[in-house]
């Protein structure tokens, strides 16, 4: 859009989008959607248009379940018409506890456990915490421990109350924006997908994830040792020499998927750990 703005001036750019959120926005569309990649749309474009018109809908005949908007500090929306027809602008997303943030749009289908999704983003945030303030450093660690317990089907209804309490405390007392928004994925999934939590803490069985633990591995027979996964890993969890099979240290891995997206040979796989 930069060249167009330069040629046509700011008035033209402000004519696009909404009154309070003019212009366009670039989003990274990924997840369980037919067409993934970077897209640029007018502010105010609805989630339905992005997922089903631009994204091509959900592959393999699966049902749409949610979109995580705004990266690890964002919130999840549901498959309700109210959320699907929500404009992607600052005020509309704020009204449901989400945010544009980094512009990430992760589409999820019916085979996604939202508790696992919340844990995924909490693990990332906990690893990224600088550790300066206690609410973020210790609070996110405690929340991650609770989510681990819930995923293992060992949680309780009291854990859900504790997650709510910790989320409120951390968001109100953390020193920087990372800590203040770190709990949004947990807060939004508790609000909109509470049934997923209840399957773990009441039924003690989730038909989607069954409390399974997964780890990422590199298949040596497919790995060419190109090093792309290693260069893209934000946690330096991948090791290996050029032209030799690489390996992933799952003690460092945060399951962000950067290696999976970077590998041109399909050598990255997720396997279930034995109990």
Regions found by a protein language model. Give the residues of each.
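Ferredoxin-type iron-sulfur electron-transfer modules in oxidoreductases and energy-metabolism complexes
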Residues: 85-215, 220, 235, 240-245
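Iron-sulfur cluster-binding cysteine motifs and their immediate structural context
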Residues: 135-141, 228-247, 258-274
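Short, small-residue-biased leader/transition segments that mark boundaries at the very start
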Residues: 1-6
């Amino acid at each position: 859009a930069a060249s167009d703005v330069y040629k046509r001036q700011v008035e033209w750019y402000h004519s696009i989008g909404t009154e309070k959120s003019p212009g366009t926005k670039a989003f990274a569309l990924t997840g369980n959607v037919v067409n993934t990649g970077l897209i640029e749309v007018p502010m105010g474009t609805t989630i339905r248009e992005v997922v089903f018109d631009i994204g091509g809908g959900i592959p393999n005949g699966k049902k749409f379940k949610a979109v995580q908007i705004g990266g690890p500090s964002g919130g999840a929306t549901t498959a309700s018409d109210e959320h699907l027809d929500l404009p992607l602008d600052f005020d509309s997303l704020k009204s449901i506890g989400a945010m544009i943030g980094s512009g990430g749009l992760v589409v999820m289908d019916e085979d996604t456990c939202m508790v696992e999704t919340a844990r995924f983003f909490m693990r990332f945030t906990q690893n990224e915490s600088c550790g300066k303030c206690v609410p973020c450093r210790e609070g996110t660690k405690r929340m991650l421990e609770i989510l681990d317990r819930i995923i293992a089907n060992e949680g309780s209804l009291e854990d859900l109350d504790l997650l709510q309490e910790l989320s409120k405390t951390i968001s109100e007392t953390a020193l920087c924006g990372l800590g203040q928004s770190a709990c949004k994925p947990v807060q939004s999934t508790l609000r909109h997908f509470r049934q997923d939590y209840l399957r773990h803490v009441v039924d003690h069985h989730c038909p989607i994830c069954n409390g399974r633990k997964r780890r990422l591995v590199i298949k040596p027979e497919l790995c060419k040792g190109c090093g792309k996964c290693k260069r893209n890993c934000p946690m330096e969890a991948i090791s290996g020499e050029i032209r030799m099979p690489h390996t992933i240290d799952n003690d460092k891995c945060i399951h962000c998927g950067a290696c999976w997206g970077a590998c041109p040979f399909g050598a990255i796989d997720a396997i279930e750990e034995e109990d």
